[in-house]
């Protein structure tokens, strides 16, 4: 346990940021699952709206440093391939 006042404050800040990051990562997983469900149901319109939501959320998470920008790009690319296969 930290004894220095600034170290104690850093522990509180880290806990807060960790919770926020967990919430955002959990929301990302939920958005991806919604897209996957729409894709499995072969629902084109719902898949398009879900993809837009996922894409925006991934970009925001990458810009805030919660996930790496390459991971966001890879996820978006793979989901876009699925969406395009549904349209074809």
UniProtKB/Swiss-Prot annotation:
GO MF annotation terms: small ribosomal subunit rRNA binding; structural constituent of ribosome
Pfam families hit by this protein: Ribosomal_S20p
GO cellular component: cytosol; small ribosomal subunit
Source domain of life: Bacteria
GO biological process: translation
Keyword Coiled coil: no
Keyword Ribosomal protein (UniProt): yes
Keywords linked to the UniProt accession: Ribonucleoprotein, Ribosomal protein, RNA-binding, rRNA-binding
Membrane-traversing stretches: none
NCBIfam families (alphabetical): S20
Free-text function comment from the UniProt entry: Binds directly to 16S ribosomal RNA.
PANTHER family the record matches: 30S RIBOSOMAL PROTEIN S20, SMALL RIBOSOMAL SUBUNIT PROTEIN BS20C
Family of the protein in this entry: Belongs to the bacterial ribosomal protein bS20 family.
Protein name (Swiss-Prot/TrEMBL): Small ribosomal subunit protein bS20
